[in-house]
């Protein structure tokens, strides 16, 4: 019995067409699997065939289809050869690095005379590329290294030295380092002035003034104090000159330091100069900038503070009678802002009553030797004595 009996041919025609198409696809797959692709030794390899093992053009493809595809890939990888496909766009990664992770399967053009030509740039001392026409690498400016290495497309300027040795007239050199003020050494000479704390990296040199700029005249009320200060400074200069005989023999943190002036060791300007941008106000005042090379403002090399709008004392600090006292100046006797400080720096903070007996500040130790009280001990003793006086007054009342 015929299974298709009674079934119209019009309903069977779509099914027959689908079967015919399925058989054609099977035959084409068998043809692709059998590897019946043309071998053209003089032509470039078919990139699609090398990558997938198939070719949709079949026997009409004009490229070469080698039988051992894996051998071709391994040989090209060992030789470092990359396909040259004239007419195709150039491989950007190949032009930058000279290599290509896709190898012979890459569909772009790899000209041999341009291998890594885009990556041939000069390197800085850390091995990162210098690209003057590109923007600075922000990550490199912050951390000092770059995870992209030689393939980074941004500029990596030469790093500035953080430490440098500055030779002095003696037998010793002192490394410069940026640090905050420390509590030693102190000025230990017995005089009518408070203790002076020298910052780290600062070497005393005779004849230098702590603050730059022209010194203005002082008020008549401070004439006597200034005269005492100058006499004391001259005496200390003579004493230190007789001991050192004009030579500087190394820096001892525990020894007494003359107040004839100090000179900060010079360093190279590591802050960016941006002529078209506003000036960094903090840098103009202090000569320092916490943002460093990433600061967006201008840092002129020849930094000149604006002329002060008030009178300056003999040590170059502003006298502003109506303003509050500079806390740092009253505590340490110096001011990092110099003539640009907006607070008052009177000379009277350095002096106290000269008629007071100095025996009150000298105590005897257990060994029988006398020693001088420090500033903190003197203040504590004064506080204790004032407390006792208050107690006695309350008892009498």
From Swiss-Prot:
Residues 361-397 are annotated as: Disordered. It comes from the Eukaryota. Keywords: DNA-binding, Metal-binding, Nucleus, Repeat, Zinc, Zinc-finger. Residues 364-397 have a biased composition (Polar residues). GO terms for biological process: negative regulation of translation. It is found in: Nucleus. GO terms for molecular function: DNA binding; mRNA 5'-UTR binding; mRNA binding; nuclease activity; phytochrome binding; zinc ion binding. GO terms for cellular component: cytosol; nucleus. Its main location: nucleus. InterPro entries: Plant_ZF_CCCH, Znf_CCCH, Znf_CCCH_sf. A zinc finger (C3H1-type) spans 40-68, 85-113, 131-159, 274-302, 320-348. Disulfide bonds: none annotated. PANTHER family: PROTEIN PHOSPHATASE RELATED (PTHR12506), ZINC FINGER CCCH DOMAIN-CONTAINING PROTEIN 33-RELATED (PTHR12506:SF18). This is Zinc finger CCCH domain-containing protein 33. It comes from Arabidopsis thaliana.
